[in-house]
Amino acid sequence: MNKDIDVSSLKIDLYSDKSVRDFTADVAQKDGRMWLSNVSAEIAAEAAALAVKALRKSGLGDADMKNAEHFIEVLRKFFLKTVDQELQSRAEWDKEVAEGKSQAYIEGGVFAACSEIDEVLYGMIKLIDMIESVSDKLAPEACADAAAAVSIGRSAMECVKLQRYHYSTLITGDVNSMAMRREPELAIADCTERYEALYKKLQDKLK
């Protein structure tokens, strides 16, 4: 969500306050605050970290490599921030439900939540495109990290799609529900073949 939300009076366990152990324990709770949407952003950050490592292993003397490293490092920090932003947004959403707001008002929150996790989806598409643009310049010893970034990044995209599937069950109207599901499906399908080829290319460079 792009709007500023006053969450000072709400009790929120933020990702930034947790260790990996605590975060994964929260994810495992059936009624926990860490949803698939939070996991998608965390996975995206891991993919970005691996991509940055691959670029740094390969050397940043080339302008394209340096630009890619800077852009993906910014994305890594953005994805981590998104984990907490989504938690804060849902805290406000839960408050609206508790206060008995109208269904239309609550559905507005659902659509806003979708917009927020979409930034993970499209940010990851841009990230993998950046890896592809410099793939010929990656050192062989960096390609395992780069290939893993592609694979893990695609998992983050699938998590966004599945979270949208869940969100689609919270709104009324078949058209709206279908549209909420179809957007990530189409975005992922549009790049699947290309990303599979990139993964194979990077894997082959390890031989």
Residue positions per predicted region:
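Conserved, well-structured ligand/cofactor-binding cores
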Residues: N2-K207
